[in-house]
Amino acid sequence: MFENMMDLGSLRHGDELIKRGFAKMTKGGVIMDVTTAEQARIAEKAGAVAVMALERVPADIRANGGVARMADPLKIKEIIDAVSIPVMAKVRIGHISEAYVLESLGVDMLDESEVLTPADPFFHINKKIYKVPVVCGARTFPEAVRRIFEGAAMIRTKGEAGTGNIIEAMRHIRKVNDGINVLLRLNESDMKKVAENIASSYFILRKETSKELFGYDNFPDMDDLYYGMDSDKIINGILKTLKEIKKYRRLPVVNFAAGGVATPSDAALMMKMGLDGVFVGSGIFKSKDPARMASAIVEAAENYEDYKTIADVSSGLQGMEGLEIDNIERLQERGW
């Protein structure tokens, strides 16, 4: 269905075509978090379409606390050398320099990730300034629109990383899908109002500065708000993204599940919900049998409506120990 609705040749820029095209190559597959070259080889053997190189899986980041940053370049190089599939790496939200460093290492894709400690309290990276494609998380339809406007080549649910609990990933895909459903019913005037509302996130810094300087937050100068863009350019760019979504009746980039996928059935559920693929963080290498779990999740994602096969590959498997959401820090709330 995605192929029928997406005309890659109609995308706006050459770089955008290449970035979205690369991301689309992962469609239907599973991307696995790995912390060592050996884990990367296990993931590749199990059928992962790509691996995400990082220092610690989200469950360990959550348990250990502290500031979580990009992985050691040496570790990333070791993982790149160990496998033939694409290697991704996480960058802190808004950390322009980390993104350039990772790009220089030759990673195939960046993940501007809420799992790491954010670097910028106001803005995400302008993904259009990098040659390497970038994936971003989204809890809601407006978040997804903002990230695509900024140049994200792939969107994923945020879920609640490191918990083994699928409920938040399900919440996020429901909200994004319902946002699309509402958008399809809007006229041009209503779409402009939606664009203005979604764009308001980029005005927060200027409003705060205005209040600090003048005592009120409606300073009329709205130039140079985000990477040199004024308010009109931001609103029109977001409106253009909304029109693209309305045209295709879905996000114009691949949309993956992430955050809490811990079993083959979880992976099948996400595919059943219409997602294009699955990220698995802690769910594989925090399970009792990582190699079997990795293969089973790949099998379930590929055959998500073949419930007999899912039952067979799940038999005897034990998932990671899960966490209830209510009493933990919500990593998903990082980002804006």
From Swiss-Prot:
Catalytic activity entry: aldehydo-D-ribose 5-phosphate + D-glyceraldehyde 3-phosphate + L-glutamine = pyridoxal 5'-phosphate + L-glutamate + phosphate + 3 H2O + H(+)
UniProt keyword annotations, A-Z: Lyase, Pyridoxal phosphate, Schiff base
SUPFAM superfamilies: Ribulose-phoshate binding barrel (SSF51366)
InterPro entries: Aldolase_TIM, PdxS/SNZ, PdxS/SNZ_N, RibuloseP-bd_barrel, Thiazole_synthase_ThiG
Binding site residues for D-ribose 5-phosphate: D33, G162, G260, G281, S282
Gene3D superfamilies: Aldolase class I
First-tier enzyme category under EC: lyase
Keyword presence, Lyase: yes
UniProt EC number: 4.3.3.6
Lyase recorded as keyword: yes
Subunit structure and binding partners: In the presence of PdxT, forms a dodecamer of heterodimers.
Similarity comment: family membership: Belongs to the PdxS/SNZ family.
PANTHER family in alphabetical order: PYRIDOXAL 5'-PHOSPHATE SYNTHASE SUBUNIT SNZ1-RELATED (PTHR31829:SF0)
Described purpose of this protein according to its UniProt entry: Catalyzes the formation of pyridoxal 5'-phosphate from ribose 5-phosphate (RBP), glyceraldehyde 3-phosphate (G3P) and ammonia. The ammonia is provided by the PdxT subunit. Can also use ribulose 5-phosphate and dihydroxyacetone phosphate as substrates, resulting from enzyme-catalyzed isomerization of RBP and G3P, respectively.
HAMAP family: PdxS
UniProt protein name: Pyridoxal 5'-phosphate synthase subunit PdxS
